[in-house]
Every structure is written in structure tokens, then in C-alpha cells.
Amino acid sequence: MKYGNTNLPENVRAFLEEIIDDEELCDAFYSCDVEIYDEDWVKDLEENFRQEFEDLMGPGDSSYKNIKAFARDGTGALWVILDDELIGYIGTEGQCGIVSRNINEFMNIIAALKGVSLLFNFWDVDTLSSEEAFIDAYNESEEDDENDYSEVFDKFISKHGFTRDLKTIYEYIVKGLTVQPFFQVIATDDDYVDSASVLGLDGQEQLEALIDALKAAQN
């Protein structure tokens, strides 16, 4: 298996191998801000991860210690595995957080969005506060999307038995984002500040606001 010389979990290695071996599928994920690279890239990042992490987040203590990068986005941010299970994001502007409960749900989310950027279109409290708002945002994004990878992603979804149901995708997203304890970095240098959540550059306030909105919707 490719990526066999990396420290990534086997299920993550299997997805990376499938994607990197299929040019169309790799391009499709690239369009969604999930840039998959070869084993040498992963291995090099593993060897230099401490410095890479500090370059992105500054000096600090992470709430999760077992962090392994498996992809980048277009800004240079990292998609990572936390504790060999959770999927996290480490941004370039001081933000980080958990985005999915596992690699299967993460891959399902990306494939179901079909070329729509998860990061730029859906990570905000208003969009995620209800199923209806999320589905409206999805429909608007699909209309504006210039890249059509529907056929490629449909094949990927069918192969893995993933869902296309947007209500289920919404559930995957909000349950992933609201996993606790939060993935955050507490600054250990006075010249830096604590990390923000992926929902906004204000510490964890936006994430807590989302949790409150979801609880209110259930009452």
C-alpha cells in the first residue's frame, strides 16, 4: 500500500492512495480545497511537523497531542488526523478546529458537496444553525460552481456506500465541528494569542454560539 512508510492510520492511507491514483478524483478533491500529495510529501511533513505547526499557530500548547497531517488546502493550511480518528483543520490565520468525527464522514462530506468549497461556503454560524439554512447555502453554491465533478464524486460515493442526503451531510458537519474537547492552541508567548475556531477569529465564541443555536433549535 502507498503511504505505508507514513504514520497515518490505515483507513486514511487507503483513501489517499485511491485519490492520488485517480487523476480526475484528485482534481475533484483539489477543487474542494483538499489537496492530496504523494507519500514523500506526507513523510517530509511528518519529519518537520513541529516546525510547520509552530509556523502556522505560533508557540503554544495544543489540546490534542497526536496530530498527523494528510493534505493541504489552497491557502497552505493543513487537514490533519487527531488521535488517529478525528479530522481537524489548522489554518493560516490562527484558526484551528475539529471538522469531522472520522475520515469516512469527512470524505463523504467533501464528495457530497461536489466541487463546492467546504471552507469558504459553509463554515459560519448562520449557515449551520439549521438544516434549511445549510441546504439553501448548498443550492446557491452549486449554482455558482464553475467546476462540475458530479460524475466523479457520484462514482466515489457509490463505491464507498456514502450518502447523498443533505440532511445527513448537515448532521455530519455540525456534529464534527462541535466535538468536545475543542481542538485549540493556547499561546505560550505573550506576543501571540490563543487560537480561534474555524468559524471565526474570536477564540471559541463562534463555535459556542453555534452549539447554543443548535440547542435552541431542539427546544
Where do the PLM segments sit?
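A surface-exposed partner-binding patch
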Residues: 1-92, 141, 145-219
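Compact, glycine/acidic-enriched structural inserts
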Residues: 88-129
